[in-house]
Amino acid sequence: MRLDKYLKVSRLIKRRTIANEACDAGRVSANGRPVKASYDVKQGDIIEITFGTRTVKVRVEAVAEFTTKDNAATMYTVIE
């Protein structure tokens, strides 16, 4: 699954276009490397997202095309 879609489905970022812009601006990295929105997310990846002065680091636990709002938080584990 593409990184921008994963960020939207898991509700880490509200809209896919914003996720795409964040990737283009270099504010998203996977496994320590800056990545594009087309990066293929795999289970076990470490994704780091910078929101202004705050940084969120998560481990990908599941990759699903669709999920409910209640189950979205089960797709990742917050590390920092």
Predicted regions: what is each one?
Residues T53-E80:
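C-terminal structural segments of small proteins and small subunits
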